[in-house]
């Protein structure tokens, strides 16, 4: 923002976790913002599945959020009864014995749907708004105009694309080829498992929250994490309390025989077949998956960031739009929060410091590009190393 356009808002495209975090930071600082989301409110909430871990970015998230929201994060943990400063285990799936243990550190494993709802509290979000184009005019270089497919438009001092891994903002910024996602030679499927306390007990013995591992002979990788517990899913005081977990498997794609089946039934059969040689507790948990289970084909892709033309400092990217990465390191959300914190600091500095003659245009993209490029490559390599070595989470 320059001094000639002090009231133009920051335009945030995408009401995902990172976009909402940035919006909260700007609102907290009294800086005008507008959030636009492609999907409807109902579809946006429906798309927030499973859970995520906030670890090294906890301080950055606290910086972005008002205290009353940050203090409620512990309430939306997948199991608020746990002190989540536990170790993180990478198992030999044939024995369920840890091969590698990452030391305990402060972290919060939170339900994604509840986190999205919390981050959206008090924000004005414009739904059903799909990006068509953006334009920075030579006549008005201190602003950017965004046009949507419904024919409406808006003008702001900065456009931040937080529209996910398949970001339209990124593809418009760099072109379709340079902005396209990179498919990886790995196949992955995932499902939700619902368990009674008795069914969950054997898994809880391994770890009550999350673990991952690989089988030394088949190379099949598996991730388990708790998604909800009776305390947060409303079943605590009912006759049938239950736990929900997230199960993901992946394997290297070498030929067509490694392809993911087309139907839920066939994917479920493959999920169970892959677990045949897992340690008994893991195998039996997977064998109990009901025949009508929905098993998702998770398409693993990434995008390693490169320098982009930020249109004179008026257009930038954050979160998955800036550095789509695989989930093996468990860091994507944390890097997105770090992006939001860094951008909000720069925006606040430009907004409050008349000495920054370029205003928002002075805010650098380089930390996002250089550091996140390294991390995206490491996340890509983590799956290839999973069979033999530790994954640093």
Curated annotation (Swiss-Prot):
Q: Tell me, according to the record, the phenotype of the null mutant.
A: Does not lead to any phenotypic changes.
Fetch the Gene3D superfamilies from UniProt: FAD/NAD(P)-binding domain
Going by the UniProt annotation, this protein carries glycans at: 128, 233
Pathway involvement of the protein, from the record: Secondary metabolite biosynthesis
Instruction: Provide the species name.
Output: Emericella nidulans (strain FGSC A4 / ATCC 38163 / CBS 112.46 / NRRL 194 / M139) (Aspergillus nidulans)
Keyword annotations: FAD, Flavoprotein, Glycoprotein, Monooxygenase, Oxidoreductase, Signal
What is the name of this protein?
Answer: FAD-dependent monooxygenase dbaB
Flavoprotein is among the record's keywords: yes
Stated induction or repression of this protein's expression: Deletion of the conserved eukaryotic csnE deneddylase subunit of the COP9 signalosome leading to defect in protein degradation results in the activation of the silenced dba gene cluster. Expression is positively regulated by the dba cluster specific transcription factor dbaA. Expression is also controlled by the transcription factor flbB.
Upper classification of the organism: Eukaryota, Fungi, Dikarya, Ascomycota, Pezizomycotina
What family is this?
Answer: Belongs to the paxM FAD-dependent monooxygenase family.
